[in-house]
């Protein structure tokens, strides 16, 4: 399949899946088609505010299967479907990505060559506010060349995005 055909197919898939997945409260973050021998792999990444659960990914998988089974968009060649969450390895490219990662640590490469690592404090449609070394910095998205969420094993629990749940049992247990 040529690159132009593949782009058209991705666009058609996204158009067919957009409304059914929005009905589940999910946004399509990426559609990828990769050749794998005589088959293709169709990967659909979904997300929503607060992140997606495994049950929501399973429900999205069933819905994508239902829609594609009733469509000709994938043609006759067999394919394997993978529905996933967005994942932390994908760059933050849209305002909703910044909003959904409030409280997380990000590494930002700026268009002018500078770089910074800071925590997302707030964001809107035009800019993000970061805490960089204790200093609040407002950054317009237009200034950002690339931004990636950093994986933290000991993430602070008193910042934005913290729900206050430490994962422990709030009820007293019996001995």
From Swiss-Prot:
InterPro entries: Ribosome_maturation_RimP, RimP_C, RimP_C_sf, RimP_N, RimP_N_sf. One of its GO terms (cellular component) is cytosol. The keyword tRNA processing does not apply. It is found in: Cytoplasm. Pfam families: DUF150_C, RimP_N. It comes from the Bacteria. Residues 152-175 are annotated as: Disordered. One of its GO terms (biological process) is ribosomal small subunit assembly. Belongs to the RimP family. This is Ribosome maturation factor RimP. It comes from Nocardioides sp. (strain ATCC BAA-499 / JS614). The gene is rimP.
